[in-house]
């Protein structure tokens, strides 16, 4: 159990049997009375959000979450198949739990899969992925008047802004947290 004073942004708690993550946290000390802790909580199963205020001394349950390294194998038409990197067990994750990372998810990528009561509830990509460019406008040397970046499509279908010298077939490194171009991967 967490005391209200231990709550912080990003902390995962359990309320009424569901896991929540604290999206925003604010400490409020009124002129008179107990300190208050205002939290914006997001249900990790449904995605719904709500605000809740705790008083000092209130207790909140810890979410029983487990994170495992798993490799994304394939999409079977309905679910995404992941394999545990230590036990080699395979699980199927519904599209709703993969939606946030789908545009950068490539086969054979090792991800962190979050489990609640032995059920996969979320997938986190590594901080950086390397993907090949499949579509890009051609670059004309000396063409700097049109701006510093151009849109390209990578092999997963995601559209990104990259420097104009990047061409089709090249592999680029992408920061998955911001979906920004980092660098061209040297062969």
From Swiss-Prot:
It is found in: Cytoplasm. GO terms for molecular function: translation elongation factor activity. Keywords: Cytoplasm, Elongation factor, Protein biosynthesis. One of its GO terms (biological process) is peptide biosynthetic process. Disulfide bonds: none annotated. Signal peptide: none annotated. Coiled coil: none annotated. Pathway: Protein biosynthesis; polypeptide chain elongation. The keyword Cytoplasm applies. The keyword Protein biosynthesis applies. GO terms for cellular component: cytoplasm. InterPro entries: Elong-fact-P_C, NA-bd_OB-fold, Rib_uL2_dom2, Transl_elong_fac_P/YeiP, Transl_elong_KOW-like, Transl_elong_P/YeiP_cen, Transl_elong_P/YeiP_CS, Transl_elongation_fac_P. Gene3D superfamilies: 2.30.30.30, Nucleic acid-binding proteins. It holds the Pfam family EFP_N. CDD domains: S1_EF-P_repeat_1, S1_EF-P_repeat_2. Belongs to the elongation factor P family. Involved in peptide bond synthesis. Stimulates efficient translation and peptide-bond synthesis on native or reconstituted 70S ribosomes in vitro. Probably functions indirectly by altering the affinity of the ribosome for aminoacyl-tRNA, thus increasing their reactivity as acceptors for peptidyl transferase. This is Elongation factor P. It comes from Desulfosudis oleivorans (strain DSM 6200 / JCM 39069 / Hxd3). The gene is efp.
